[in-house]
């Protein structure tokens, strides 16, 4: 689409991007993000000792982008989606939610609640479907559904990584 992409990575593995910066997210400075139209927070923290970094890093990025026109797009999780129109019940709190993902989903919910308090940043929290399929091909179809859990005609909540990535760029 003609976008210029810069990837910030904390490890030695370099993704397929035009520009790669090897720097831990908490070491990123405001000058590192100068001139960017958008910053995508797709950080993955999975272990009990790193889960709190979801909140810490999103607030760090928010501080860096405060008062700028740069958009902060945050890759969230389905667990924070609401199960009701009154927004009183979230997927992560449902008995059917897989126990092994509950700590991660709770950390991402905390991340969402932390960024909600920031009116000084242009942010969007993008939750994928409940089934987030890495091996599925791009179909060119996805649904933007707000903050409520939705399913397709077959009663499934599913999106491929590829379609989700397109949705993030389209936003």
Language model: regions and residue ranges:
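Short, catalytically relevant binding-site loops at active-site mouths
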Residues: 45-48, 78-82
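Short beta-strand segments at enzyme active-site cores
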Residues: 41, 73-75
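Oxidoreductase cofactor-interface core, primarily capturing Rossmann-like NAD(P)-dependent enzymes
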Residues: 1-6, 11, 68-72, 79-171
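NAD(P)H-binding glycine-rich loop region in Rossmannoid oxidoreductase-like domains
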Residues: 12-68
């Amino acid at each position: 689409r003609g976008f210029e992409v810069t990837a910030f990575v904390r490890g030695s593995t370099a993704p397929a991007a035009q520009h790669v910066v090897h720097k831990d997210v908490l070491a990123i400075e405001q000058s590192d993000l100068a001139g960017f139209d958008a910053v995508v927070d797709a950080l993955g923290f999975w272990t009990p000792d790193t889960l709190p970094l979801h909140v810490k890093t999103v607030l760090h990025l928010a501080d860096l982008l405060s008062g700028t026109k740069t958009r902060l797009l945050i890759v969230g999780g389905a667990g924070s989606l609401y199960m009701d129109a009154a927004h009183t019940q979230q997927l992560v709190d449902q008995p059917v939610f897989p126990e092994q993902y509950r700590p991660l989903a709770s950390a991402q919910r905390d991340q969402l609640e932390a960024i909600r308090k920031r009116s000084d940043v242009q942010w969007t929290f993008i939750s994928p479907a409940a089934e987030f399929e890495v091996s599925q091909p791009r179909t060119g179809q996805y649904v933007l559904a707000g903050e409520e859990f939705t399913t397709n005609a077959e009663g499934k909540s599913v999106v491929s990584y590829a379609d989700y990535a397109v949705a993030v760029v389209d936003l």
